[in-house]
Every structure is written in structure tokens, then in C-alpha cells.
Amino acid sequence: MANLSSLPSPIYCVSFNQDNSGFAISWKDSFKIFDSTTGRLCYERAAGAFVIVEMLYSSDLLAIVGAGEQASLSPRRLCLFKTTTGLPLRELNFLTSILAVRMNKKRLVVVLLEKTFVYDLNTLVMLDTIDTVPNPKGLSAFSPSLEGCYLAVPASTTKGSVLVYNVMDLQSHSEIDAHRSPLAAIALSSNGMYIATGSEQGTLIRVHLVSEATKSYSFRRGTYPSTIYSLSFGPSTQLPDILIATSSSGSIHAFSLSLAINQRSKRSTSFLGSVLPDSVSDALDPAHHHVLQNAVSSGIRSYAVVRKIDKLEGTSSPSHFTSLRATVSVITYNGYFQEYTLSINNKNESLWTLEREFNLFSITTG
């Protein structure tokens, strides 16, 4: 879930579902559910302002939290809502405002300022309470896979440490010291194998292997500080091919993880890799950074995901051969949906192509 921007914005919240096949947006008087593939408006409800609208894949179950602008829509009340009936299924009330909600087919996670609650989604029995450092932005990441189901939340307010918690086993997994300054963005791959982090400085993105927290790879987003708005891995059962990031600079950044890490692994076995210190050798080749400048107006909050990856194998093809094609969906907080194709050839040259763009406020049902 991407949270409210400090800048004026007609959109209150944006969220993609667990496989990025659908997304939800809300503003001052309603929320809408869209199909990511077709852009079709699937559901709309004019019932006031909501700060959280979380989907469960493409099912009819939503987790919604009001903005508090109406007495009936308290930010301390979580409503599990059925779109097929238009009625609430269950409600959970808390002492403080709900800042984030995550769920998969078995677990429901509710993030508050200094506590995070884990529930069984089917029975709503509380399974665990996690005490956290103050987390006013509700910063969190969740991997929906039942085999590698992890939650990541900040572990410090003074540096970029992240707590990784196993949501199925109900125990802390590890604590990762990722940055010197506090965290601004976290993402987990859908299979729970990799975690990406960005700090408030916003110049470096780091990727850690969750099972081996000390092993990291660094990608330079830019030279000057910038606010990272979103991080998202591409879909994969193993190592994701792409990590996507958006920032206050208005650019979209794509990092070729699989190519970069595989090349790093080969280099680490060489003599040069063996003599370089970790702080130098973990900085990956900037050639694996594919940036689209000025995709969004500077300062406009945006949220991007990699919806689909197509890989075309072939080692004897000409240099213009497209070896990877990524479909990137972007939502801006001034109300636009954009879809790009990022094509990367076997010489690691890239091309961004805008496939479609439309105003989310102008789409109606029917």
C-alpha cells in the first residue's frame, strides 16, 4: 500500500493486489477497483473517504479503513468488506489509527504506530502482537506466498534497520542493517526470497537475500537525494528479473537484478572479486540501471509495479534481440494510470515505450 503524500493530492490511497492483476484507488468520496490488464473499472463504491483499500487477489474481499472525515469511517476501524454483497463481513477496532493492512489467503496483518497485529484471516483470531519502533507512515512490506510469507517493518528510527518476521511461523526471522539513515521504502519479492530497501537519503537501493541477511547488493538510484515513493519486484518464482522504483525526481528506475547479480557472482570467483572489499564489490554495474526520465512531474507521488515479464531466450541472436520485456504499470497521485513496456536486449540496451495512459477519474462502469 502506498500511503498519503505530504503534497496536496486528490488520491488518498493506491494499492495493487498480491499478483498485480488489479488495483484500487480512493479519494474524498469513493473508491474504485480496476483490472490492471484491461484498465476496466470493476467496482466502485461512493461511501466516503478511505485511507486503505486492500485487495485479496481478485476475490470479492476487501480490507478498508476510513479517513475519519465521517463519524462512521473511523481510521481506527478495519472493515472486511464483500463487493458482491456491498456489505461488511467483519470489523476490527483498535485504540489508535490503522496505518497499513496486508493479507494473503491465510493471514491478516494490521500495522499501527507502535504495534503490529497478526490474525488468522478465516477466523480473525489474533495470533501474535509485534511491538515495533514508532512507524508513523505505516512503512511495511509483505510477501503473500504461503511458503515464504514474511513481513518487514522498520527496526530503528535513527538508521535503516528492518525487522523481518515470519508470518506463518509467528516468529522473528532476522534484523537487517541496510542503511545509515532511516528507511523510506521496503519491498519483498512475492516468494519472500529477496528484500529491497531505500533510505530517506534516496541515493542507494539495497537488495538482501532474506535467508542470508548479511549478503547484499547495491544499486545507485541517483547522485542527489530524492524521496523514494515505491519499490516493487517483478514476478518470479526465484530471483526476480526486475526491481522497479519511483521517486520525487519524477523518474522511473528499473534495475536488472538477474543479470547484475549473476554477473556479480561470476566476478566474485575471479581474482579481482576476491581482493575487492565488500563495500566496493557489492556496488553493481550501473549499466544494469534503466531509467525513464520525467515520466511523472517532479514532486508528484507515484506507485509502480512490474505486472508481467516476458523472457526470450537466444544466445546466437543479433545485438538488437530483445531478451527481456517488462510490463510496468504506474499510478500517479494526481489521478493517472500509465503502462510502459521496458525492452532490454542482449547487449543490455533498453527502450521504454508508453503503451497507454488514462485519467482514473474519467473511467466509469458500463
From Swiss-Prot:
Keyword Signal among UniProt keywords: no
SMART domains in alphabetical order: WD40
Subcellular location: Preautophagosomal structure membrane; Vacuole membrane
GO cellular component entries: phagophore assembly site membrane; vacuolar membrane
Topology versus the membrane: Peripheral membrane protein
Biological function: The PI(3,5)P2 regulatory complex regulates both the synthesis and turnover of phosphatidylinositol 3,5-bisphosphate (PtdIns(3,5)P2). Required for autophagy.
Family in the record: Belongs to the WD repeat PROPPIN family.
Entry's free-text remark on domains: The first protein part may form a beta-propeller domain involved in specific binding to phosphatidylinositol 3,5-bisphosphate (PIP2), leading to the association of the protein to the membrane.
Summary of subunit composition and partner proteins: Component of the PI(3,5)P2 regulatory complex at least composed of ATG18, SAC/FIG4, FAB1 and VAC14.
Protein name in UniProt: Autophagy-related protein 18b
Natural source organism: Arabidopsis thaliana
Classification of source organism: Eukaryota, Viridiplantae, Streptophyta, Embryophyta, Tracheophyta
Name of the gene: ATG18B
